[in-house]
């Protein structure tokens, strides 16, 4: 039995309701996918609703290089299973600055750093997935905001702004968060200080200059 969202609705129905709202409200949609359980479920549910409504969406996958093979394999499966409703896939293998939890000498490191290619944990995707890869050598010329070593959090915001300008109109983006997994995630959802889209408590409205 599905988990009860409230006395009249379970979480699955509530999720489909929110996804349909997004498709009806926004001119373009992209999902931020990590290959983890939350964003994977979000992507699969969005694909089901997209087929029902005759819609398409894009995904942003930021590949941080030092990731489990099982995660990479799972992302490939997600892309294959949802390919019929995917507009664009942005598989980013870019030199971003990341926190390093295994060293007190080097608190940060840069993934996919070309000068350290001999030390890469793994190679970039090949075969049929190579066409999705965006790296330091082929990123769009419009990305004049991109800099080697930029912060992960900054990249996401710049990407969202670029994606919106590319498509025009209103853009919606999906992020898989389970509010009962951590206090910070719960506070992110229920915060009354953020600007919400049309008053929906599970949304955050962002405007770029």
Task: Please report, for each region that a protein language model flagged, where it lies by residue.
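ATP-dependent adenylation/nucleotidyltransferase module used to activate substrates
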Residues: 1-209
């Amino acid at each position: 039995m599905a988990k009860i969202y409230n006395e009249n609705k379970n979480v699955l129905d509530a999720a489909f309701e929110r996804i349909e709202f997004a498709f009806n409200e926004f001119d373009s949609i992209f999902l931020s996918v990590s290959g983890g359980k939350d964003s994977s479920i979000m992507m699969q549910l969005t694909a089901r609703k997209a087929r029902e409504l005759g819609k398409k969406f894009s995904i942003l996958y930021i590949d941080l290089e030092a990731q489990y093979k099982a995660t990479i394999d799972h992302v490939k499966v997600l892309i294959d299973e949802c390919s019929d409703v995917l507009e664009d896939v942005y598989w980013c293998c870019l030199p971003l600055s990341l926190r390093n939890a295994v060293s007190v000498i080097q608190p940060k490191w840069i993934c996919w750093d070309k000068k350290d290619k001999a030390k890469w944990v793994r190679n970039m995707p090949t075969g049929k997935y190579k066409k999705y890869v965006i790296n330091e050598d082929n990123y769009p010329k419009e990305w004049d905001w991109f800099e080697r070593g930029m912060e992960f959090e900054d990249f996401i915001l710049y990407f969202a702004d670029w994606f919106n300008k590319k498509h025009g109109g209103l853009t919606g983006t999906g992020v898989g968060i389970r509010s009962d997994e951590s206090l910070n995630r719960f506070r992110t959802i229920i915060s009354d200080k953020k600007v919400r889209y049309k008053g929906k408590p599970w949304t955050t409205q962002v405007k770029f200059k």
